[in-house]
A protein has these predicted regions:
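Detector for outer-membrane/organellar transmembrane beta-barrel domains
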Residues: 154-282
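Short glycine/acidic-enriched loop and turn motifs that connect beta-strands
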Residues: 139-140
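Beta-barrel outer-membrane channel/assembly domains of diderm bacteria
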Residues: 2-111, 116-136, 145-156, 166, ...
Length: 334
């Protein structure tokens, strides 16, 4: 009996060790949308999405696979394999290789869509306080393209972070982030090698009492230059859906937004007011959004978002139209 108990204990410990470096995390959300336009037409839509992240680890090497399950997909599209990559160290170099996207917090992240590149590799190291790196992407046929080669650096200067990255024969990006006089500053410039194709983004935030105030803006030389469609800052983006600049809103070359956020009795309240700036011959399209979110005892978070937005691409002299959207979101992370 003792031998059986010892064997069982050993087996349990071995099993625990075997799975100790494998983890599964994720999140899920259910969304309801009620939209009414100027003509009085009302639509009701819903969406269910589950995201799962699998991570395996061996020493300094990790392997990540992220999956998205969407209720509205068919047999071919309901399951989307998103990020699939590994990270490791080779001497003093950090290596990330596979299919992965950049976030909106990355340099130029609020300007360019952080699309996934096939078989991308990112190699970086530190030289004192300076981080330098090289990033190489491939096309959908796994063919390495020179136009997808990027070098970058991040340098701390007097409490600020200065960043630069250059994509050969395409653009050079600059960014600074820091704080001055109680105001948090993030400013980024994309200088294109193509004439009249530069984009400036900046975001300023400060806290007054219990309220966080913000002002953010994007200023482009022309329409069609901004591809990010899932901003973490703006209530309305200069691009829609997916597809990068191919889905940029037509006749829009800028956006500005004022915001205020606070907490009231456990509810996080945010107000955003702004405007999509139109190109010559079109009307600017204003928008406002108020949202409230609260963590529930069940472990979920309930969010209610109301957005009133004018329609872009309405020519000067034409009657402006708008829409009102009520969104209810029930989300959980695990």
């Amino acid at each position: 009996m003792k031998k059986q108990m010892i064997a069982a204990a050993v087996a349990a410990s071995v099993s625990a060790v075997a799975v100790a470096d494998i983890s599964i995390t994720g999140n899920a959300n259910y969304e309801y949308f009620n939209t009414e336009n100027t003509a009085g037409v009302t639509t009701h839509t819903t969406d269910t999405e589950i995201n799962l992240s699998f991570k395996g680890k061996s020493g300094d090497t990790s392997v990540v696979a992220n999956l998205e399950i969407d209720s509205h997909g068919n047999a071919d599209t309901a399951l989307d394999i998103e990020d699939t990559y590994m990270t490791t160290k080779i001497g003093d170099f950090n290596v990330k290789a596979g299919n992965f996207a950049s976030s909106t917090s990355a340099l130029l992240g609020e300007i360019d869509a952080g699309g996934r590149s096939t078989s991308k590799v990112d190699i970086s190291t530190t030289l004192g306080d300076i981080k330098v790196g090289y990033n190489q992407g491939s096309n959908t046929s796994d063919i390495v393209e020179n136009s997808a080669s990027t070098v970058y650096a991040s340098i701390p200067v007097a409490g600020w972070t200065v960043q630069v990255k250059d994509q050969s024969d395409s653009y050079t990006g600059f960014g600074v982030a820091g704080s001055i006089g109680g105001v948090n500053v993030r400013a980024e410039q994309k200088n294109s090698d193509t004439a009249n194709s530069n984009v400036l983004f900046y975001n300023l935030t400060t806290k007054v009492g219990d309220v966080t105030l913000g002002y953010a803006a994007i200023d482009a030389d022309a329409s069609g230059l901004v591809g990010e469609e899932d901003s973490s800052i703006f209530a309305r983006e200069m691009a829609t859906g997916t597809g990068g600049t191919s889905n940029a809103r037509s006749d829009v070359d800028g956006v500005w937004q004022l915001s205020a956020a606070t907490a009231v009795d456990g509810n996080n309240i945010t107000l955003k007011v702004g405007e999509l700036r139109a190109t010559t011959g079109n009307q600017d399209a204003g928008f406002s959004q108020v949202s409230a979110s609260r963590k529930l005892a069940s472990g979920t978070t309930l969010s209610v978002i109301y957005t009133d937005a004018e329609t872009e691409s309405i020519t000067t002299g034409s009657t402006m139209t708008d829409s009102q959207t009520l969104e209810v979101d029930l989300a959980v992370s695990f």
